[in-house]
Amino acid sequence: MRLPSRQQVLKMLATFSLALGLFAAKVQAHGGVIGYSWDGTWYEGWHPYNTPVGQTSIERPWATFDPIMDATASTVGCNNDGNPGPNQLTATVAAGTAITAYWNQVWPHPYGPMTTYLGKCPGSSCDGVNTNSLKWFKIDEAGLLSGTVGKGVWGSGKMIDQNNSWTTTIPSTVPSGAYMIRFETIALHSLPAQIYPECAQLTITGGGNRAPTSSELVSFPGGYSNSDPGLTVNLYTQEAMTDTTYIVPGPPLYGSGGNGGSPTTTPHTTTPITTSPPPTSTPGTIPQYGQCGGIGWTGGTGCVAPYQCKVINDYYSQCL
């Protein structure tokens, strides 16, 4: 029997790895932004699996933890149809303030970019405004931070390291007014790329006078296409193991003077936290993949045999 060539082996491995990524995408939980904080205040996000009756939030409603896998979908703006919630709130934030968004779980996808956009509403409030009608500009991005496309450190990996949170500073030059802020993570571990956007309603005060240029503005849908290089990259090819460049999808960063697809990244800091001791591995009733510990966790810590409670980060331990 003739042995396969090296090229054939590499191709088979790439195909197998991609298949594993596709399988993992189906069995792993996904999620979205479930809260925001700045200046010491917590703003509760939308809870997509709770009844909408009585929910009040600065975040626009969204219905599912599932990813958006069509970059031109009508929901790609804010993971919804663009409409506000029944009891929509607005939060006030000063230009120059750092806003932190928090995801619902230990994020399972460390390979992909993080982006943050602002979209200015036409009046004094975003109440009643459909977000699909807005023009958006990007104020933050972090793509491939170091290493290679196939084995490097990505913005989403840094988000995970920051306790599943991402902090973006509102530029001090942004004009005051009513805005939507859009936090987004894109997962590249399988194709099509998985897009996870959520939006919240703001009033920005104390701003500047630098409006975004026309080249910095995009619509959603419309800002991405399914053929964008930043959405079609294959992490499992031989080239990906040596390639050190990645083009973040979307327009150029606000104020950068670029032409879009910039690899520019923004430094981010992590808020110090108090760590909790590792949970015990006493046999119990928590099933595989269940939570068994973490800061603020008041449930059980014992996993069913043969699984053990493993620390994922300070806020989350899991039966594995």
Curated annotation (Swiss-Prot):
Signal sequence interval, chain numbering: 1-29
Keyword check for Acetylation: no
Induction cue: Expression is induced in the presence of cellulose, but not fructose or malt.
Chemical reaction(s) catalysed: [(1->4)-beta-D-glucosyl]n+m + reduced acceptor + O2 = 4-dehydro-beta-D-glucosyl-[(1->4)-beta-D-glucosyl]n-1 + [(1->4)-beta-D-glucosyl]m + acceptor + H2O
Chief location: secreted
Statement on biotechnological application from the UniProt entry: Lignocellulose is the most abundant polymeric composite on Earth and is a recalcitrant but promising renewable substrate for industrial biotechnology applications. Together with cellobiose dehydrogenases (CDHs) an enzymatic system capable of oxidative cellulose cleavage is formed, which increases the efficiency of cellulases and put LPMOs at focus of biofuel research.
Cofactor requirement: Cu(2+)
Binding sites annotated in the UniProt record for O2: 189, 194
A GO biological process held by the record: cellulose catabolic process
SMART domains linked to this entry: fCBD
CDD domains: LPMO_AA9 (cd21175)
Record has Metal-binding as a keyword: yes
Positions annotated with a glycan in the UniProt record: 163
Key words, A-Z: Carbohydrate metabolism, Cellulose degradation, Copper, Disulfide bond, Glycoprotein, Metal-binding, Monooxygenase, Oxidoreductase, Polysaccharide degradation, Secreted, Signal
GO CC, any one term: extracellular region
One GO MF term attached to the UniProt entry: monooxygenase activity
Region (Disordered): 255-284
Family, per entry: Belongs to the polysaccharide monooxygenase AA9 family.
This protein's domain notes: Has a modular structure: an endo-beta-1,4-glucanase catalytic module at the N-terminus, a linker rich in serines and threonines, and a C-terminal carbohydrate-binding module (CBM). The CBM domain is essential for binding to and subsequent oxidative degradation of polysaccharide substrate.
Function according to Swiss-Prot or TrEMBL: Lytic polysaccharide monooxygenase (LPMO)-like protein that binds strongly to cellulose. Seems not to acts as an endoglucanase, a ceUobiohydrolase able to hydrolyze fluorogenic cellobiosides, a /3-glucosidase, a xylanase, nor a cellobiose:quinone oxidoreductase.
Protein name: AA9 family lytic polysaccharide monooxygenase-like protein CEL1
Lineage, top ranks: Eukaryota, Fungi, Dikarya, Basidiomycota, Agaricomycotina
Gene name, Swiss-Prot/TrEMBL: CEL1
